[in-house]
Amino acid sequence: MKKKKTWKRFLHFSSAALAAGLIFTSAAPAEAAFWGASNELLHDPTMIKEGSSWYALGTGLTEERGLRVLKSSDAKNWTVQKSIFTTPLSWWSNYVPNYGQNQWAPDIQYYNGKYWLYYSVSSFGSNTSAIGLASSTSISSGGWKDEGLVIRSTSSNNYNAIDPELTFDKDGNPWLAFGSFWSGIKLTKLDKSTMKPTGSLYSIAARPNNGGALEAPTLTYQNGYYYLMVSFDKCCDGVNSTYKIAYGRSKSITGPYLDKSGKSMLEGGGTILDSGNDQWKGPGGQDIVNGNILVRHAYDANDNGIPKLLINDLNWSSGWPSY
């Protein structure tokens, strides 16, 4: 919602940082919970591995067109790749006349022989938004095919079609979660061929008493439960950000999702996983990778509040996520 307007303003000072590389303490630690933190800007991250290379994608910077893309062969030395969607697609303005030059909060997954990339275009401060889809058989070779509109929202809707998350149920069926503020997080089943909605729209999380401040859903299935993580409160304000990661779980992908105290996430429930610390402020925009890795951004209080990528292994041994 309004977070993106603030984020755009926040990034005006960032162009000098674009040449820096991401540095992690380990490429793929088997047991160490914390992989490391980046020295580069990345916001609303999603991460995937193709062959021997890691790719991290995020919201585009104000100084760039398209989605930001980073690549590493060892998760220690990262290079900035050509952005995706450097040329705007013509249909975006049909649904979002006032969209910016960058796109927001991508999610990438591999399914049925293709990489599926969901992303958002929106107008600042409103729910005039659209989620789009692109596909490719290879990240490294590019060649992204525009798959068009997935779902949209307007002022007549009670939800906001941004922050997409492709997930799968225990039987391997694809679903899409999305949402930001308004009436909260939505979930819909996808057609396996088109990867677009084919069923009902379910509500799975909301914050009716907190100004609706939640967004950025990510889901995974572990040990008989579906786990939903969301971001609470305010992002995109540097060290003054109050973003935090909250979670709940359900036996059914469509809910109800309950936190550790038993409160429904539709009633504002959510157990806090990460609210930051003295250095890392406002962690959120999270994505669960392969079921056991969590990526998110946080604002570095030791570096002018610049948002950086943090990566942790997730531990599920207690029946709840931890790191």
Swiss-Prot record:
Entries under InterPro entries matching the protein: GH43_arabinanases, Glyco_hydro_43, Glyco_hydro_43_endo_a_Ara-ase, Glyco_hydro_beta-prop_sf
**GO BP annotation list:** arabinan catabolic process
Output the Pfam families linked to this UniProt entry. Glyco_hydro_43
Q: Name one GO molecular function term.
A: metal ion binding
Keyword Secreted attached: yes
> What is the predominant subcellular site recorded for this chain?
secreted
Cellular component terms, GO, for this chain's entry?
A: extracellular region
pH-related activity info reads: Optimum pH is 6.0. At pH 4.0 the arabinosidase retains about 8% of activity.
Per the entry, induction is: Induced by arabinose and arabina,n and repressed by glucose.
Is Hydrolase one of the keywords UniProt gives this record? Answer: yes
Q: What is this protein called?
A: Extracellular endo-alpha-(1->5)-L-arabinanase 1
* Highest classification ranks of the organism: Bacteria, Bacillati, Bacillota, Bacilli, Bacillales
Primary gene name: abnA
